[in-house]
Regions:
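Catalytic-core helical/loop segments in enzymes performing group transfer/polymerization on anionic/lipid-linked
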Residues: 1-318
Length: 318
């Protein structure tokens, strides 16, 4: 299929694609395993489903073979990430002694590339430019919930990172501060169960769309995000802090945002989640669009702030 044919196929079947996924979501268990499933999230860069659906490609490999192959890769990769995360926790405890000065009320949830901070000698991200100055202008206290990124291959680079952040005058909070030893056993348990919980989503193969979905579902096990579980546990901890009123998050509504939202909304009725989508979006970046069904499943934020009127969606609940 050439690009023109692919585009024609997309235009003809894009509504069918959305309806199919929504139907699967409605009839699935609404728990963390469903919330973080990459096939249902429809990220074209982290799922085989969008491309296969529009190419009408059900795959040639037996689904059992696909599952076993990805199961082995899944456990190998995520065991490594769990060990790396445990090391990051230990490094945090050793090298980060700064504590939040003010009571946690407003949190700005964003991420930072560890290498960039280490190179520049300061935290200065370009995604939420202006929001810090806005809060400071109106004398509104805030804390930055910082997600260190791209350190898994070498957690020891976090030593310098934490030393740099310690020198910043602003309040910072890291997920490691809230972690307990039992959380690592929870992580391990969720991780071990995830591939088998995925099998609950397999559809009875009545149509070719069902075959495409099932093949993609099993192949997408390799796209599982370990961070989706750590963010889920973080959300549960934050939901228990009574002083928190609002959390502003940079959001592409990917799996890490969904699991975080789900944990907070399931366990707290008073924390307001504000998603900030200050980027140029495009139609086929399917995962970034928040639906009313996502709100029903508690994986959506309460409000989404977008980059202009063009991006405002006709939703009833979000």
């Amino acid at each position: 299929m050439n690009p023109k044919q692919l585009n024609n196929s997309y235009q003809k079947t894009k509504d069918d694609f959305q309806h199919y996924i929504d139907n699967v979501k409605r009839n699935s268990p609404w728990d963390i395993y469903t919330i973080i499933n990459p096939t249902l999230i429809k990220n074209p860069y982290a799922s085989e489903l969008p491309k296969r659906f529009f190419l009408n490609d059900a795959g040639q490999v037996n689904n059992t073979v696909v599952f076993i192959k990805n199961l082995f890769k899944f456990y190998l990769k995520n065991t490594y990430l769990l060990v790396s995360y445990l090391m990051a926790f230990a490094i945090y405890k050793l090298y980060y002694k700064k504590r939040v000065r003010d009571e946690l009320k407003i949190i700005i949830d964003t991420f930072s590339l560890v290498d960039n901070v280490n190179k520049n000698g300061e935290f200065n991200e370009n995604y939420l430019t202006g929001i810090y100055e806005l809060f400071e202008k109106y004398n509104t206290n805030y804390a930055i919930l910082l997600r260190p990124c791209q350190f898994a291959k070498n957690p020891f680079k976090l030593r310098h990172f934490f030393k740099i952040i310690s020198q910043d005058k602003r309040d910072f909070i890291f997920e490691y501060e809230l972690l307990k030893l039992s959380d690592f056993f929870t992580l391990l348990s969720l991780m071990l169960l995830y591939p088998f919980k995925t099998l609950r989503l397999l559809q009875k193969e009545v149509s070719k769309e069902d075959k495409i979905f099932n093949h993609s579902l099993l192949a997408d096990i390799k796209y599982f995000s370990f961070d989706s579980l750590t963010r889920y546990i973080l959300g549960k901890h934050l939901s228990k802090i009574d002083s928190i009123e609002k959390i502003f998050s940079w959001s592409e509504f990917q799996v890490i945002e969904r699991s975080f939202n789900y944990a907070i909304r399931k366990n707290s009725q008073k924390i307001e989640l504000k998603a900030l989508q200050f980027f140029l979006n495009y139609e086929v970046y399917f995962n970034s669009y928040v639906d009313d069904l996502d709100d029903d499943m508690l994986s959506a934020p309460h409000e989404v702030f977008v980059n202009g009127r063009y991006y405002i969606q006709n939703r009833e609940k979000v």
